[in-house]
Amino acid sequence: MLPIHRSFNTLSLLTLINVMLITFCFSVEKTAEKNKIDFEIHSGYFVSNKFEPKKPQSFIITNEQKIFDSAFGIAFVQGDDSNRLKEGSLKSKIVISTIKRGSFFCDYDVVSLTNNKGELELRYNLKKRESSTAEYSCPLIISIPKIDYKSVKFIENGKLIKNLK
C-alpha cells in the first residue's frame, strides 16, 4: 500500500506544479497586456540626408516639431495614402523612431510597445531586402500619447540594440 501512497503524492505534486505554471503563464500574459501602449505607425516620410548620414542606425525620441522636421521630410507620391502625423499632434504625442541605413530596404513589423514603470520597450522585427544598386534610409516612425518615461528600449528581432535614457 505504501508505494500507492507515494505515487499519489507524486501525482498530486505534479498536478500542483502544472496548475502553478499555467497560472503563472496567464499572469505574465495579463501583465504584458495591461502594460501595452496604444501607438500609431506613420509613413510617407523620407529621411533628411543631413540627419546623421554617416550612422548605420539612428534613434529619435521627441515631441518637438523642429527636431522631427530636422530628421524627416514629407515624401509626396501619386495616389498617396500614407499615415502622416496630423499638424500640431506633437503637442499631445511623442515620436519614437529608428532609422536603418545601408544597401538594403527595410520592412518593419512592430510586435509590441509596453510601459513597465516608465521604461518603454519597443519590440519589432526587421527584414532586410538587399540591393546592389542603391543605398536606403529606412525609418520606423511611431507616435504614442505623451507620457512620462525614463528610458526607451529598442528590441529588434528579439535583441536589445539600444536603450535611450
Residue positions per predicted region:
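Bacterial Sec-dependent N-terminal signal peptides
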Residues: 1-33
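Exposed, flexible binding/inhibitory loops of compact, secreted disulfide-stabilized domains
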Residues: 25-165
